[in-house]
């Protein structure tokens, strides 16, 4: 499965990064970090009919290959911010998504809205990295982690002042997210194991989610009417990437959905 391949490659990369920059040295670099985590909950919590979008900076994906040839991460991020994105998701996985932590750092220096580090995170080191490079929240994929691991990473993120978006795809993932104490739950319509889509997933899972949680819908979102339908089900915000990346003007495409 592709998820296993990504996970293994991420583990190899992480081992190398830890050798180059040990945990304590990474932590010390926070002393010169001028950025403090922003209020992610406030940014994503829906207010009445307001449409909140986490717009994604994404060059490629394992299923589609390169999505955006003329890829300028900072220009894309600034266009998103100008067109009222609630937050920006930055892919930092280099092999399958052509992302980079440097993109995150660059975007942080020139934007004011919350940033999500989107990667395959399973180690506290990666969460500390996210903070050092300017993220305000991190992606944790429930499918990749045991409940104990998920809980530990959630608690560590909060200890650093970061939030976590816990991504789920089925009832088992949801149980894990709730019992681990997730505040922000992302329902991914795409199954990461085989890339099939189930656009009815929010309808199936939202009734099982406590009202206190912030709910994010992910994948396959490109229609304003469908976004309104999901809002009526209880979705707070939407994570959209590929649709914007295929448009000539990603900012204009974003604005059209608001």
Curated annotation (Swiss-Prot):
Pathway involvement of the protein, from the record: Amino-acid biosynthesis; L-tryptophan biosynthesis; L-tryptophan from chorismate: step 4/5
Enzyme class: lyase
Disulfide bonds, paired cysteine numbers: none
Superkingdom of origin organism: Bacteria
Reaction(s) catalysed by this chain's protein: 1-(2-carboxyphenylamino)-1-deoxy-D-ribulose 5-phosphate + H(+) = (1S,2R)-1-C-(indol-3-yl)glycerol 3-phosphate + CO2 + H2O
Keyword hit for Lipid metabolism: no
GO biological process: L-tryptophan biosynthetic process
UniProt keyword annotations, A-Z: Amino-acid biosynthesis, Aromatic amino acid biosynthesis, Decarboxylase, Lyase, Tryptophan biosynthesis
CDD domains: IGPS
GO MF annotation, one: indole-3-glycerol-phosphate synthase activity
Pfam families noted in UniProt: IGPS
Protein EC: 4.1.1.48
UniProt record similarity statement: Belongs to the TrpC family.
PANTHER family linked to this entry: INDOLE-3-GLYCEROL-PHOSPHATE SYNTHASE, TRYPTOPHAN BIOSYNTHESIS PROTEIN
The name this protein goes by in its record: Indole-3-glycerol phosphate synthase
Native species: Campylobacter jejuni subsp. doylei (strain ATCC BAA-1458 / RM4099 / 269.97)
Gene, per the UniProt record: trpC
